[in-house]
Amino acid sequence: MTTLRLLISDSYDPWFNLAVEECIFRQMPATQRVLFLWRNADTVVIGRAQNPWKECNTRRMEEDNVRLARRSSGGGAVFHDLGNTCFTFMAGKPEYDKTISTHIVLAALNSLGVMADASGRNDLVVKTPDGDRKVSGSAYRETKDRGFHHGTLLLNADLSRLANYLNPDKKKLAAKGITSVRSRVANLTELLPGITHEQVCQAVTEAFFAHYGERVDAEVISPDKTPDLPNFAETFARQSSWEWNFGQAPAFSHLLDERFTWGGVELHFDVEKGVITRAQAFTDSLNPAPLEALAERLQGCLYRADKLQETCEALLVDFPEQEKELRELSAWIAEAVR
């Protein structure tokens, strides 16, 4: 009986793909070796311990319908579009060895005519007249009896958009999280014009089979034809939830300040796991009472634009004479934290 398993996703949904990856990883026999090939539509994928408000331009992501997905491995933030080919290698211990999967990807690139090398922070690079350029980045996860190595190959990614979403607004964030290292990158199409996702997947698959000396039929999966994965519905619900993607952020502080015609405002937030644990308001407004009430009510509020806006607008009941000021304040807060 073969020890290999090959899965290929037809879905571009990052939450679906990451949920599939998580379920396979949890339920696979320790003797199995798995290759999972997939790709995501427009998504910023962040590491398990990263702060999305620190790493991402969340406002632009919302405007452009770009999703946020938190993965279960460590590492930095990356932008995925359909110009990225994603791979995941899984194996039980002691078979699991990330140098093996790195070798398989390098062999696949070599078979396509691209000479690449492993470098530094889990990257694969190619040499160009402008110096080394990154074509692949990876992250890893290990448990007691198994491990996985997943990463992306930059095929024909829109690199200008990558910069748009991974360069955050100059917010005054004093974060305890880590800001990712930005890397010089290149697309494989610069080296191999016309190369396709299917060709890259085929090359990785053949290198996988060649390394282990076995072949196996691919299992093609999508939301309409998922494999038998225990607890998939629960895993997908968690993967797609705000609580996981945003609420798992490290503790951080955020300062907002603005001057209105009726006075200047400073709001200070301390946020833990996506919830405001402390809020302070400072103002030279002639009537500071609404802001004082807002600071009190924001404690315990989810750090989401819609929730902050709801809390602010709820004050209209208690301060109807300050409707203009409160509506201006509400619109500003909602825009500032996106």
UniProtKB/Swiss-Prot annotation:
GO CC terms, sorted: cytoplasm; cytosol
Pfam families per the UniProt record, alphabetical: Lip_prot_lig_C, LplA-B_cat
The BPL/LPL catalytic domain, residue ranges: 29-216
Stored InterPro entries: aa-tRNA-synth_II/BPL/LPL (IPR045864), BPL_LPL_catalytic (IPR004143), Lipoate_ligase_A (IPR023741), Lipoate_protein_ligase_C (IPR019491), LipoylTrfase_LipoateP_Ligase (IPR004562)
Pathway, per record: Protein modification; protein lipoylation via exogenous pathway; protein N(6)-(lipoyl)lysine from lipoate: step 1/2; Protein modification; protein lipoylation via exogenous pathway; protein N(6)-(lipoyl)lysine from lipoate: step 2/2
Domain of life: Bacteria
Keyword annotations: ATP-binding, Cytoplasm, Ligase, Nucleotide-binding
Membrane spanning residue stretches: none
Record: residues binding (R)-lipoate: K134
Annotated GO biological process: protein modification process
EC number: 6.3.1.20
Subcellular compartments: Cytoplasm
Known catalytic reactions: L-lysyl-[lipoyl-carrier protein] + (R)-lipoate + ATP = N(6)-[(R)-lipoyl]-L-lysyl-[lipoyl-carrier protein] + AMP + diphosphate + H(+)
Binding positions (ATP): R71, G76, A77, V78, F79, K134
Family matches, as Gene3D superfamilies: Bira Bifunctional Protein, Domain 2, CO dehydrogenase flavoprotein, C-terminal domain
Subunit structure as annotated in this protein's UniProt entry: Monomer.
Miscellaneous comment in the UniProt entry for this protein: In the transfer reaction, the free carboxyl group of lipoic acid is attached via an amide linkage to the epsilon-amino group of a specific lysine residue of lipoyl domains of lipoate-dependent enzymes.
Function: Catalyzes both the ATP-dependent activation of exogenously supplied lipoate to lipoyl-AMP and the transfer of the activated lipoyl onto the lipoyl domains of lipoate-dependent enzymes.
Protein name, as recorded: Lipoate-protein ligase A
Species of origin: Salmonella typhimurium (strain LT2 / SGSC1412 / ATCC 700720)
Phylogenetic classification of the source organism: Bacteria, Pseudomonadati, Pseudomonadota, Gammaproteobacteria, Enterobacterales
